[in-house]
C-alpha cells in the first residue's frame, strides 16, 4: 500500500532506521548534540500571540530531511506559503509543545506519540501578524502515512538538510515573493520558495548544525 501526497508516493512498509542516518551534511547524533542542550532565546510580550511549530526531521533515502508544508489559500494568514506544521495555542493545550504536536497531527496526521522531541530553538517573531513562534525540533518515522489537512495543507514535501546547509542553495536575498518585498534567507527547492519565518527558523537550525557537522560523531 502507498499514500499519495502531491507527487510523492509514500510506502507504508515501515523500515527500521539506524540511530545515525548518515548523510554528507549531518547525522542524527549530531542533531541531538546541537539541539538537546541548546539554551534558547525566548521572546515574550503582552501584545504577541503565542504559537508553536514542529520542525520534523526524518531519514529518507539514507539522509536527513526536514518536512515542510505548503498552506492552502483557505487559511487566514500566509496563504500559499511554505511553513512548518504549527499554529496558535488553544485553551486545551497544556503547553506550547502540546500546541506544536496537536497542529502537526491536524495538518499532516503525524501522531504525537510518533515524535521524538529533541528540544527547542530560538523563538521567532512575525511582525506582520504579531505572532511569536516557538519551534520544537523532533524526529519522526519514515515511511509514514502522512495525510494533508484539506482545509490547511495543500502539500507535504521533504527537503534534504544538505540542501539547506549549502550556502549556494540557502542564503540571504532581496526579492519580491508573493507580491511582498523581502530581505532574508531564501531557498528555492522543487518549485517551492522557503522564506519568511520558516526561512529564519531553518537558518538558525542550520547555524547550530553547521558547528557540530564539523565534529566527527562516533
Feature locations, PLM:
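N-terminal leader/linker segments that precede catalytic domains of diphosphate-processing enzymes
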Residues: 3-4, 9-12, 21-83, 88-144, ...
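Short, conserved charged micro-motifs
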Residues: 147
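Amphipathic alpha-helical blocks and their helix-capping loop/short-beta junctions
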Residues: 150-180
Amino acid at each position: 500500500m502507498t499514500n499519495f501526497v502531491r507527487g510523492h508516493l509514500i510506502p507504508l512498509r515501515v523500515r527500521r532506521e539506524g540511530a545515525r542516518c548518515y548523510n554528507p551534511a549531518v547525522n542524527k547524533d549530531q542533531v541531538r548534540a546541537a539541539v538537546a542542550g541548546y539554551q534558547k532565546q525566548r521572546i515574550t510580550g503582552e501584545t504577541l500571540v503565542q504559537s508553536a511549530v514542529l520542525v520534523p526531521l526524518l531519514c529518507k533515502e539514507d539522509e536527513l530531511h526536514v518536512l515542510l508544508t505548503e498552506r492552502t489559500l483557505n487559511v487566514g494568514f500566509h496563504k500559499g506559503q511554505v511553513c512548518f506544521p504549527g499554529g496558535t495555542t488553544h485553551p486545551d493545550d497544556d503547553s506550547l509543545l502540546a500546541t506544536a504536536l496537536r497542529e502537526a497531527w491536524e495538518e499532516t496526521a503525524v501522531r504525537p506519540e510518533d515524535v521524538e522531541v529533541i528540544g527547542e530553538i530560538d523563538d521567532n517573531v512575525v511582525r506582520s501578524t504579531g505572532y511569536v513562534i516557538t519551534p520544537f525540533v523532533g524526529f519522526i518515522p519514515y515511511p509514514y502515512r502522512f495525510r494533508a489537512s484539506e482545509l490547511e495543507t495543500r502539500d507535504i514535501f521533504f527537503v534534504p538538510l544538505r540542501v539547506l546547509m549549502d550556502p549556494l542553495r540557502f542564503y540571504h536575498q532581496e526579492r519580491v515573493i508573493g507580491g511582498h518585498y523581502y530581505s532574508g534567507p531564501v531557498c528555492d527547492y522543487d518549485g517551492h520558495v522557503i522564506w519568511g519565518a520558516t526561512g529564519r527558523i531553518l537558518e538558525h537550525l542550520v547555524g547550530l548544525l553547521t558547528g557540530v557537522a564539523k565534529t566527527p560523531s562516533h
